[in-house]
């Protein structure tokens, strides 16, 4: 039997370490409530590259490149309870992690 009660939690961050720590804290909170969990599933890293001139006046060939990497994780929670939702909303996550919760 397939149930339609599912919560999808997506995590975004520029730092992999705090992203994995946040995912583990969410997994521990879900395991305490005895709900089924799928994940954390690593999603493809989005890389934005910026090229700028090193000198404002001359040396067009001299350039510098910067990149910004956005790491993502996906966690599916099957058959969530209202107590689990309250604990997820009250969960303290480090700064720099964006959380997107959808049903």
From Swiss-Prot:
InterPro entries to which the protein is assigned, alphabetical: Ribosomal_uS10, Ribosomal_uS10_dom, Ribosomal_uS10_dom_sf
Disulfide-bond pairs as recorded: none
Domain of life: Bacteria
UniProt-listed GO biological process terms: translation
GO MF, one example: structural constituent of ribosome
Pfam name, any one: Ribosomal_S10
Biological role: Involved in the binding of tRNA to the ribosomes.
NCBIfam families: PRK00596.1, rpsJ_bact
Protein name: Small ribosomal subunit protein uS10
Gene behind the chain: rpsJ
